[in-house]
């Protein structure tokens, strides 16, 4: 009874909602360091070794981190074994993941899977074997990252492992890494038939990622009445997954919406080598702990950001997707012909107000709806309906300031705004639309007497 209480307490500590679980071993970031380095420097409390990618005929793959072998050809990773013990001394939980997106693995029957449970226990757990890839280091459990849609034997394997765990003197854990569509096609049976401790749900490379049809509620309903903790699985960078990488502000928003769920355990990352680059892992840790402020990538903006421009003395505001080419908080100036027009007008006895009376300010500015797929082509160059006079005259400068906003689209996507400007005149009763044109109302107010000034100007210049 006391042992069971200790195990439950250990699980509750490991499954704290501020936890980060990180996969290590496949070098997704391109500069993978040793397991010990990440245990010492990262906030991850659970690190999953990936992968045992071949079974029942054993095969291990840790990219650039293990080159030794036994005489049988099985990988012998003494440094990883030493790091496992060091990590555990620092309070880290170390799991060994079975499967992966590629590999030669699977069972022909439940009986074969039950037999393989003994192999796992003896080579990586509390059992004994002459060839232990991590020497005397003992992992804290096993993760099922099965992705080949063959579910044969995994429930039987997990059930048998639980029996071995009960004979040990420490806490052991079982986890799964399902894709976010529910139920998962590769570990759905395992998750419905066996009590697991964690689920590192892959909310990427699918339609149910955080910035699409996020389906946390489906998984929360599955976890109801169970002791399992659900992790928000994210890619560590845009290059470590085909799709689904999101900025910190999106993560903060989602975490705020689900952190009250008793089944929420934290965030899981694929993988730690990519998430360490740029400090993303530490930012996620701050998001979970509630500290820190939203990051504002300089080349990405969220939708529905107010955009205000002033035309002919009137101001129009619209909500739009802003081109990633802008910089938050920057001021962009443009030269107008207001002073020039006023000066010419005064030569003929007209006042500024007489010019202004013909100007109908912009009536509406509308934004193009969010595109289904962000464009990656160059931004269209808008044309202007007013002359800039090559800076010869002392024109006034109007400016537009974009407020600082936070990203809800991946930084590597480019989104453009299309403004529809309606310009009217008392001399033209019908209204007309112009797309991709930012027009100044002054440009519609050219009085016929000004045409006399053009030959005079040409004569002076000659």
Curated annotation (Swiss-Prot):
Keyword terms, alphabetized: Carbohydrate metabolism, Chitin degradation, Chitin-binding, Glycoprotein, Glycosidase, Hydrolase, Polysaccharide degradation, Secreted, Signal
Function according to Swiss-Prot or TrEMBL: Chitinase involved in the remodeling of chitin in the fungal cell wall. Plays a role in cell separation.
Keyword presence, Glycoprotein: yes
UniProt record, GO biological process: chitin catabolic process; filamentous growth; filamentous growth of a population of unicellular organisms; polysaccharide catabolic process; septum digestion after cytokinesis
Protein location: Secreted
Reactions catalysed, as given in the entry: Random endo-hydrolysis of N-acetyl-beta-D-glucosaminide (1->4)-beta-linkages in chitin and chitodextrins
Assigned GO CC terms: cellular bud neck; extracellular region; fungal-type cell wall
Description of the deletion phenotype: Leads to increased hyphal growth on solid media.
Induction description: Transcription is greater during growth of the yeast form as compared to the mycelial form and up-regulated by micafungin treatment.
UniProt xrefs under CDD domains: GH18_hevamine_XipI_class_III
GH18 domain location: 18-291
Protein name: Chitinase 1
Glycosylation sites: 57
EC number in record: 3.2.1.14
Gene this protein is translated from: CHT1
Signal peptide as annotated in the record: 1-17
InterPro entries in alphabetical order: Cts1-like, Glyco_hydro18_cat, Glyco_hydro_18_chit_AS, Glycoside_hydrolase_SF, Glycosyl_Hydrlase18_Chitinase
Family listed: Belongs to the glycosyl hydrolase 18 family. Chitinase class V subfamily.
GO molecular function term, any single one: chitinase activity
């Amino acid at each position: 009874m006391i042992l069971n209480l200790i195990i439950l307490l250990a699980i509750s500590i490991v499954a704290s909602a501020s936890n980060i679980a990180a996969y290590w071993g496949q070098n997704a970031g391109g500069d993978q360091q040793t397991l010990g380095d990440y245990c010492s420097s990262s906030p991850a409390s659970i690190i999953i070794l990936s992968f045992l990618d071949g079974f029942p005929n054993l095969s291990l793959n840790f990219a650039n981190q293990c080159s030794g072998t036994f005489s049988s050809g099985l990988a012998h990773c003494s440094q990883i074994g030493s790091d496992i013990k060091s990590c555990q001394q620092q309070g880290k939980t170390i799991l060994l993941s079975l499967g992966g997106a590629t590999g030669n693995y699977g069972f022909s029957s439940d009986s074969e899977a039950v037999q393989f449970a003994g192999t796992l226990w003896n080579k990586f757990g509390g059992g004994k074997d002459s060839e232990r890839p991590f020497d005397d280091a003992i992992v804290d459990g096993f993760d099922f990252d099965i992705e080949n849609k063959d579910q044969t034997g995994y429930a039987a394997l997990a059930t048998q492992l639980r029996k071995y765990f009960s004979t040990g003197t420490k806490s052991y854990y079982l986890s799964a890494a399902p894709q976010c569509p529910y139920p998962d096609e590769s570990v759905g049976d395992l998750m419905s038939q066996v009590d697991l401790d964690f689920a590192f749900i892959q909310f990427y490379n699918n339609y149910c990622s955080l910035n699409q049809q996020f389906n946390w509620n489906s998984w929360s309903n599955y976890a109801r009445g169970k002791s399992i903790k659900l992790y928000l699985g994210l890619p560590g960078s845009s290059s470590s997954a085909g799709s689904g990488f999101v900025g910190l502000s999106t993560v903060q928003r989602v975490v705020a919406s689900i952190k009250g769920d008793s089944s929420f355990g934290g965030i899981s990352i694929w993988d730690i080598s990519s998430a360490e680059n740029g400090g993303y892992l530490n930012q996620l840790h701050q998001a979970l702990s509630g500290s820190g402020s939203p990051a504002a990538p300089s080349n990405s903006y969220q939708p529905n950001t107010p955009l205000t421009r002033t035309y002919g003395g009137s101001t129009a505001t619209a909500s739009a997707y802003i081109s990633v080419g802008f910089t938050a908080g920057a001021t962009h100036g443009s030269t107008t012909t207001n002073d020039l027009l006023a000066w010419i007008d005064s030569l003929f006895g007209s006042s500024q107000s007489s010019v202004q009376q013909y100007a109908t300010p912009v009536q509406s500015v509308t934004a193009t709806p969010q595109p289904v797929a962000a464009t990656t082509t160059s931004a269209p160059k808008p044309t202007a309906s007013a002359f800039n006079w090559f800076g010869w005259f002392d024109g006034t400068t109007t400016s537009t300031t974009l407020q600082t906003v936070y990203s809800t689209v991946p930084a590597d996507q480019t989104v453009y705004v299309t403004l529809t400007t309606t310009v009217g005149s008392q001399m033209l009763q019908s209204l007309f639309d112009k797309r991709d044109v930012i027009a100044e109302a002054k440009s519609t107010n050219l009085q016929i007497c000004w045409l006399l000034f053009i030959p005079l100007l040409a004569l002076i210049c000659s």
